[in-house]
Amino acid sequence: MNECLLCGRKLKQDMTFDFLLSFKPLARPVVCENCQKKFKRIDFKTSCPGCGRQMSKKTICEDCKGWEKAGYKLILNQALYKYDEIMKAYVTRYKFMGDYRYRFIFADEFQKKVAEFQKQGYAIVPIPVDRETFEKTRGFNQVLGWLGKIDCENYLVMRQNKGRLKQSHKDRAMRMKTKQPFEYVGPNNLSDKKILLVDDIYTTGRTLYHAKTLLEDAGAKFVTSVTLAR
Protein backbone atom coordinates (compact mmCIF):
# COMPACT_ATOMS: atom_id res chain seq x y z
CA MET A 1 0.00 0.00 0.00
CA ASN A 2 1.98 2.99 -1.31
CA GLU A 3 -0.73 5.66 -1.19
CA CYS A 4 -2.51 7.28 1.75
CA LEU A 5 -5.96 5.73 2.16
CA LEU A 6 -7.47 9.12 2.95
CA CYS A 7 -5.88 11.59 0.53
CA GLY A 8 -4.13 9.41 -2.04
CA ARG A 9 -0.70 10.99 -1.61
CA LYS A 10 2.41 8.84 -1.95
CA LEU A 11 3.53 7.47 1.40
CA LYS A 12 7.09 7.98 2.55
CA GLN A 13 8.79 5.64 4.96
CA ASP A 14 12.11 6.61 6.49
CA MET A 15 14.29 3.82 7.89
CA THR A 16 17.06 4.70 10.31
CA PHE A 17 20.25 2.70 10.73
CA ASP A 18 19.13 1.77 14.27
CA PHE A 19 15.87 0.40 12.89
CA LEU A 20 17.72 -1.78 10.38
CA LEU A 21 19.89 -3.20 13.18
CA SER A 22 16.82 -3.95 15.31
CA PHE A 23 15.60 -6.61 12.83
CA LYS A 24 12.02 -5.64 13.63
CA PRO A 25 9.38 -6.26 10.96
CA LEU A 26 8.64 -3.24 8.80
CA ALA A 27 5.28 -1.69 9.72
CA ARG A 28 3.97 -0.01 6.61
CA PRO A 29 1.93 3.18 7.18
CA VAL A 30 -1.50 3.39 5.56
CA VAL A 31 -2.12 7.14 5.99
CA CYS A 32 0.20 10.11 5.67
CA GLU A 33 1.27 12.25 8.63
CA ASN A 34 -0.91 15.17 7.52
CA CYS A 35 -4.06 13.03 7.53
CA GLN A 36 -3.17 11.27 10.77
CA LYS A 37 -2.77 14.63 12.54
CA LYS A 38 -6.35 15.59 11.64
CA PHE A 39 -7.70 13.01 14.08
CA LYS A 40 -7.81 14.57 17.56
CA ARG A 41 -6.51 12.32 20.33
CA ILE A 42 -8.15 12.44 23.74
CA ASP A 43 -5.81 13.30 26.59
CA PHE A 44 -6.54 10.79 29.36
CA LYS A 45 -5.18 13.23 31.95
CA THR A 46 -8.05 15.64 31.26
CA SER A 47 -10.87 13.32 30.22
CA CYS A 48 -14.02 12.31 32.06
CA PRO A 49 -13.17 9.15 34.04
CA GLY A 50 -16.65 7.78 33.38
CA CYS A 51 -16.96 7.96 29.60
CA GLY A 52 -13.67 9.30 28.23
CA ARG A 53 -15.05 12.62 27.00
CA GLN A 54 -12.36 15.28 26.59
CA MET A 55 -12.69 17.87 29.35
CA SER A 56 -10.69 20.91 30.43
CA LYS A 57 -9.75 19.00 33.60
CA LYS A 58 -10.22 15.52 35.07
CA THR A 59 -13.82 15.66 36.21
CA ILE A 60 -17.03 13.69 35.76
CA CYS A 61 -19.19 15.07 32.94
CA GLU A 62 -22.92 15.78 33.21
CA ASP A 63 -23.83 12.68 31.19
CA CYS A 64 -22.00 10.42 33.63
CA LYS A 65 -23.55 12.19 36.60
CA GLY A 66 -26.87 11.20 35.06
CA TRP A 67 -25.83 7.53 34.96
CA GLU A 68 -24.80 7.74 38.61
CA LYS A 69 -28.14 9.29 39.56
CA ALA A 70 -29.86 6.43 37.75
CA GLY A 71 -28.05 3.99 40.02
CA TYR A 72 -25.27 2.79 37.74
CA LYS A 73 -21.61 2.38 38.63
CA LEU A 74 -19.65 4.22 35.96
CA ILE A 75 -18.15 2.02 33.25
CA LEU A 76 -14.86 3.99 33.21
CA ASN A 77 -14.63 3.97 29.42
CA GLN A 78 -11.36 4.91 27.75
CA ALA A 79 -11.71 6.53 24.31
CA LEU A 80 -8.77 7.17 22.01
CA TYR A 81 -10.12 9.98 19.80
CA LYS A 82 -12.73 12.71 19.68
CA TYR A 83 -15.81 11.94 17.61
CA ASP A 84 -15.57 15.05 15.44
CA GLU A 85 -16.25 15.64 11.74
CA ILE A 86 -13.08 13.92 10.49
CA MET A 87 -13.82 10.88 12.65
CA LYS A 88 -17.44 10.83 11.48
CA ALA A 89 -16.21 10.77 7.87
CA TYR A 90 -13.90 7.88 8.72
CA VAL A 91 -16.67 5.90 10.44
CA THR A 92 -19.04 6.51 7.52
CA ARG A 93 -16.53 5.12 5.04
CA TYR A 94 -15.48 2.16 7.18
CA LYS A 95 -18.63 1.17 9.03
CA PHE A 96 -21.50 2.29 6.83
CA MET A 97 -19.93 2.09 3.35
CA GLY A 98 -18.04 -1.07 4.26
CA ASP A 99 -14.53 -0.12 3.12
CA TYR A 100 -12.67 -2.84 5.03
CA ARG A 101 -9.25 -1.39 4.17
CA TYR A 102 -9.98 1.43 6.61
CA ARG A 103 -9.54 -0.94 9.55
CA PHE A 104 -5.78 -0.58 9.10
CA ILE A 105 -5.83 3.13 10.00
CA PHE A 106 -6.42 2.49 13.71
CA ALA A 107 -5.81 -1.27 14.07
CA ASP A 108 -2.30 -1.08 15.55
CA GLU A 109 -3.15 1.60 18.10
CA PHE A 110 -6.43 -0.06 19.05
CA GLN A 111 -4.78 -3.44 19.54
CA LYS A 112 -2.07 -1.95 21.76
CA LYS A 113 -4.68 -0.35 24.02
CA VAL A 114 -6.75 -3.53 24.29
CA ALA A 115 -3.61 -5.62 24.88
CA GLU A 116 -2.90 -3.53 28.00
CA PHE A 117 -6.07 -4.93 29.55
CA GLN A 118 -5.52 -8.44 28.22
CA LYS A 119 -2.16 -8.57 30.03
CA GLN A 120 -4.01 -7.72 33.25
CA GLY A 121 -6.27 -10.75 32.87
CA TYR A 122 -9.31 -9.13 31.26
CA ALA A 123 -11.52 -11.15 28.92
CA ILE A 124 -12.11 -9.16 25.73
CA VAL A 125 -15.77 -8.94 24.69
CA PRO A 126 -16.61 -7.01 21.50
CA ILE A 127 -20.05 -5.47 21.13
CA PRO A 128 -21.83 -7.64 18.53
CA VAL A 129 -23.59 -6.50 15.38
CA ASP A 130 -27.00 -7.81 14.40
CA ARG A 131 -27.29 -10.59 11.83
CA GLU A 132 -29.12 -8.40 9.31
CA THR A 133 -26.30 -5.84 9.29
CA PHE A 134 -23.67 -8.55 9.07
CA GLU A 135 -25.27 -10.56 6.28
CA LYS A 136 -27.01 -7.95 4.14
CA THR A 137 -25.22 -4.66 4.65
CA ARG A 138 -21.64 -4.61 5.90
CA GLY A 139 -20.45 -8.19 6.05
CA PHE A 140 -18.14 -7.62 9.02
CA ASN A 141 -18.01 -6.44 12.62
CA GLN A 142 -16.10 -3.15 12.54
CA VAL A 143 -14.65 -3.73 16.02
CA LEU A 144 -13.25 -7.15 15.11
CA GLY A 145 -11.60 -5.50 12.12
CA TRP A 146 -9.53 -3.34 14.49
CA LEU A 147 -8.83 -6.17 16.93
CA GLY A 148 -7.20 -8.42 14.34
CA LYS A 149 -5.88 -11.61 15.95
CA ILE A 150 -6.61 -10.61 19.55
CA ASP A 151 -8.51 -13.41 21.30
CA CYS A 152 -12.11 -12.42 22.05
CA GLU A 153 -15.03 -13.97 23.90
CA ASN A 154 -18.47 -14.13 22.27
CA TYR A 155 -20.46 -13.74 25.46
CA LEU A 156 -23.09 -11.49 23.87
CA VAL A 157 -25.32 -11.77 20.81
CA MET A 158 -27.76 -9.27 19.38
CA ARG A 159 -31.42 -10.12 19.82
CA GLN A 160 -33.01 -10.53 16.42
CA ASN A 161 -35.63 -7.90 15.72
CA LYS A 162 -36.32 -7.48 12.02
CA GLY A 163 -36.79 -3.93 10.89
CA ARG A 164 -35.61 -2.41 14.17
CA LEU A 165 -34.24 1.11 13.95
CA LYS A 166 -30.46 1.04 14.19
CA GLN A 167 -28.67 3.09 16.87
CA SER A 168 -27.03 5.29 14.23
CA HIS A 169 -30.50 6.39 13.06
CA LYS A 170 -31.74 7.40 16.53
CA ASP A 171 -31.50 10.75 18.27
CA ARG A 172 -30.22 10.98 21.84
CA ALA A 173 -33.64 10.64 23.48
CA MET A 174 -34.45 7.53 21.45
CA ARG A 175 -31.06 5.97 22.23
CA MET A 176 -31.55 6.43 25.96
CA LYS A 177 -34.93 4.65 25.79
CA THR A 178 -33.52 1.66 23.89
CA LYS A 179 -34.48 -1.65 25.51
CA GLN A 180 -31.92 -4.37 26.25
CA PRO A 181 -30.69 -5.38 22.75
CA PHE A 182 -28.40 -8.24 23.83
CA GLU A 183 -28.64 -11.80 25.09
CA TYR A 184 -25.99 -13.37 27.28
CA VAL A 185 -24.70 -16.65 25.79
CA GLY A 186 -21.49 -17.11 27.81
CA PRO A 187 -20.65 -19.52 30.66
CA ASN A 188 -23.24 -20.14 33.36
CA ASN A 189 -21.08 -18.19 35.78
CA LEU A 190 -18.33 -15.78 34.83
CA SER A 191 -16.56 -16.68 38.09
CA ASP A 192 -15.57 -13.16 39.08
CA LYS A 193 -13.94 -12.44 35.69
CA LYS A 194 -12.76 -8.99 34.68
CA ILE A 195 -14.33 -7.97 31.36
CA LEU A 196 -13.28 -5.38 28.79
CA LEU A 197 -16.10 -4.38 26.44
CA VAL A 198 -14.89 -3.05 23.10
CA ASP A 199 -16.96 -0.81 20.81
CA ASP A 200 -16.48 1.81 18.12
CA ILE A 201 -18.08 4.96 19.52
CA TYR A 202 -19.30 6.03 22.95
CA THR A 203 -22.30 8.27 22.22
CA THR A 204 -24.77 8.13 25.11
CA GLY A 205 -23.35 5.01 26.77
CA ARG A 206 -26.69 3.21 26.55
CA THR A 207 -25.32 0.27 24.54
CA LEU A 208 -22.31 -0.28 26.80
CA TYR A 209 -24.35 -0.05 30.01
CA HIS A 210 -26.83 -2.61 28.64
CA ALA A 211 -23.92 -4.97 27.96
CA LYS A 212 -22.32 -4.22 31.33
CA THR A 213 -25.55 -5.09 33.17
CA LEU A 214 -25.84 -8.51 31.51
CA LEU A 215 -22.22 -9.41 32.24
CA GLU A 216 -22.49 -8.33 35.87
CA ASP A 217 -25.69 -10.35 36.24
CA ALA A 218 -23.70 -13.35 34.95
CA GLY A 219 -21.13 -12.94 37.72
CA ALA A 220 -18.50 -10.64 36.22
CA LYS A 221 -16.34 -9.05 38.91
CA PHE A 222 -15.60 -5.84 37.02
CA VAL A 223 -16.68 -4.51 33.62
CA THR A 224 -15.06 -1.59 31.83
CA SER A 225 -14.71 -0.56 28.19
CA VAL A 226 -12.55 0.87 25.42
CA THR A 227 -13.88 2.71 22.39
CA LEU A 228 -12.16 4.27 19.41
CA ALA A 229 -14.02 7.54 19.81
CA ARG A 230 -16.11 9.61 22.20
Tell me the role of every PLM-derived stretch.
Residues 1-230:
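Glycine-rich phosphate/pyrophosphate-handling loop used in enzymes and phosphotransfer proteins
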